[in-house]
Every structure is written in structure tokens, then in C-alpha cells.
Amino acid sequence: MRNRWLIALAAIGLHISIGSVYAWSVLTRPIMVDMGFTLSQTTWTFSLAILMLGLSAGFLGSFAEKIGPKKSGLLAMLFWVAGLFGTAYALSIHSLTLLYLFYGIIGGIGLGIGYITPVSTLVKYFPNRPGFATGLAIMGFGFASLIAGPLMQYLVAHVGLVNNFIILGITYLIVMSASSLYLKAPTPKVPTRSNQDKSTMYVHNHGMLANDAMKTWQFSALWWVFFVNITCGIGLLSLASPMTQETISMTPAAAASLVGIIGIFNGGGRIAWSTISDYFGRAQTYILFFIIQIIAFYVLAETNNALTFQVLILLIITCYGGGFACMPA
């Protein structure tokens, strides 16, 4: 069996690569200015990528599990990198349609496959701490904008939009390939009551299969709370940079730095909240998310204070990241 901490490092490597999608807001204004696209046209690219992330993760999850983490990781790399190179081409000819196709659809499929691959693998190495393992696996996805935000802002300023995507594509090709080649599922063990988590025991004792679970009211409830939590965070992530520039008069460089800080809280929220949920409970943790977000969004709409505005954004993002980590656990 491979070292589980190196497996965790490989998982983080995959997620840091695809998680750069969270820094999209840094590119919003440059794309609008250089390409002549509207704000809604530009942000729809991000929305489409996130939509495809969810769809591909949902419909290709069993396929990724079947072919194994190494092959599914490499497949995610091919889609994501192809999406980035295609985006560079789309921007070079000022094509909004191709931008949607390459970044939104093709890149989005890579996001979905790349998202579930390390999560399902790493949880198997930490059978008694599923919340911690999930948070550890997707921590890189949240932290990615810490690196990608300032990096994209620098690349766009010095080499232009098109070359920015080419450089990112080459970088992620290397990182994702190396990470995928190390990923390997652990050797299966015969489950015992001492090494089974409660959810696994329930499946064995009650015979609850995926198709059966989807027919229950609990599944519908989980889907809706997950949807609401994602919507709260995505709305901020897609507009974080231009929103802070307009609302509290941040410079583009400062806004890019804030996007990086958002990455810290996004990633930190994933590992912190998921670990807390191992002891506090998943349902109770989600209730706390909603209480925090309701209060934070209300105050956010009323405040004109720059510090308060930024603190509230970061608080909401921790809940957003934590929701992603708690749900798979």
C-alpha cells in the first residue's frame, strides 16, 4: 500500500490545478475590455464550467471509479488542459461561442472528473475519519485561487490573456499528470465493525444502494441544502474581483490579492468544517452554515465599510468550502 500522505499530496496536486477555476473573477474585467464581451456573457463562462462540473461528477462518478484513479485523473487532465488551450484559441479569435465550448463545457467536464477522483480515493485511506479525508482531498481545490488569482493577474498584465491560458495549460498538464500517475486505490480489506464508519455499516445492514437512496426524501433534502450552499458561494466567487473594485474601490491588484485570500478561507473551511463535522455531526454543521450565511448576506447588503465587506465575504466562503467537504463525508 502506498503512503497515504503522499496520496493526499497527489490529491491536492490535482485539485490545486482544477481549482484555478475559482480565480475566474480575476479574468472577468480583462476579458470584457479586450474581447468586448458584457459582464453577463463573461460570467456565464464560469457558470457553465461549474454546471458541467456538477453534471460530469454526477454522471461520470461510477465510470471514474470503474477505471481507477490513475486513468480518471489523466482523463481529467486531458479535458481540463484541452479546455485551457482551446480557451486561448477562442480568445485569440474573439469567439464567445468557442469560449463557452472550451472553458465551459470541455474544461468543465475535466473539473468534474478531476474533482471526484482524489476524493473517492483518499477517503479509502482514512476509513475512520471520512470528514477529515474529504476535507484534505478537496482542500487544494479551495486553496487554488490563492496561487492562481495573483498569478493570473500577473500573467495577463505581462504576457496577455491568450498566453496566460497557454502557460496555465502547460503547467497543469505537468502537475496533473504527475499527481495522477501516483494515485492508486488501497488494497481492499475485509470490513469489520471496528474499521467501518457508521454510514458504511448502514449500507451493509440495510442494503441501501445508490438507486434506492435517490428515491428517499433524505436524498432530496441533501440535494437542496447542498444546492443552496453552493449557490451562496458561487455567486460571490464569480464576481469577487469586479464586485470589490466597484463596491469598495479596490485596485485590480488588490482585488486579485483578495481572490487569493478567498482561496485560503475556501480551502481552510473545507478541512476545518469537515473535521468539526466528524464530531459535531453533518446535519448540525449544515444548520450552522445556513445561520451564518443568512446573517452574513443580510449585513453584506447593508454595509459600506470595506473591512466589514471583506470579512463577510470570507466568512461566507468558509461555509461554502465546508459544505463541499461535509457532504461527501
What does each model-found stretch correspond to?
Residues L78-I93, I292-N304:
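C-terminal ends and interior cores of transmembrane alpha-helices
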Residues S56-P69, R270-G281:
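Helix-to-loop junctions at the C-terminal end of transmembrane segments
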Residues W24-R29, N211-T275, P328:
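Extracytoplasmic gate region of multi-pass secondary transporters
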Residues Y22, I50-G58, L146, G263-I271, ...:
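Residue-level signature of mid-helix packing/kink "hotspots" within the transmembrane helices
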Residues I31, G112-F126, A133-T134, G322-A329:
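Intracellular juxtamembrane helix-capping segments at the cytosolic ends
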Residues H15-I16, G83, L96-I113, F227, ...:
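Hydrophobic core of transmembrane alpha-helices in multi-pass small-molecule transporters
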Residues F141-P188:
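Helix-loop-helix hairpin linking two adjacent transmembrane segments in secondary transporters
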